[in-house]
Amino acid sequence: MEEIVVYVHGKDGSAQEAEHYKALFPNCEVIGFDYHAQSPWEATEEFSGFFTAVRKRCGKLTLVANSIGAFLSLSSLNEKLVDAAYFISPVVDMEQLICNMMQWADVSEAELAEKLEIPTTFGETLSWKYLCYVREHPVSWKIPTRILYGEKDALTSMETIKAFTEKNNAELTVMPGGEHWFHTKEQMQFLDNWIKNRRPCNETENKDGFASPAYSSGNRAGADGLRHQKSC
């Protein structure tokens, strides 16, 4: 059975972005997942249903997920559905991100608990339900994963991404000067090379289903306290 690659886009993205990855996975069927979920509780049903159907017709399923698409995948998928994952600028700690946005909007936890939802000037709506959900449903991830992270990512700190990497035994590659959104010619070339240098060609795959990497940032950090409840 063939290998299928499923691409999960980020906010305001499109399943059509999967076209870019067909050249990077030439011997695989590449599918863009046109999902509608806006929250992890919605993604739990939608993502598991879609990936279960795809899993039935392939020998190996590889996930490529971007930004919030990575977080929704983390919240809803497991090793029975996905064999390997590539995360691009992933949101890996939604609780921390929500707390950061509350600080940016000068909203206290008590105020959010009272009002339940508070719109912000930067286009996001703070949700008490969302904050409570991610606290009550910590991510559990056992899938071999490689992460591409921009050094200047404004949504996820270096400390947070390193902690997730260490906790989940993932491989982290950092693009110096890179942003959360990989879109410039230089950034896309870096992204393409990151995938190409890790795709199994004539190399011997390791036990995790990846070829031995041509390069690795080796960025590691302690993960102590990653999942304790944060104070917003």
Q: Can you annotate each of these PLM segments?
A:
Residues 2-27, 32, 36:
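Short, surface-exposed "cap/lid" segments of acyl-processing enzymes
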Residues 81-163, 167-201:
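The alpha/beta-hydrolase serine catalytic core
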Residues 64-69, 73:
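Gly/Ala-rich beta-loop-alpha elbow adjacent to hydrolase catalytic centers
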Residues 39-55:
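Alpha/beta-hydrolase active-site loop
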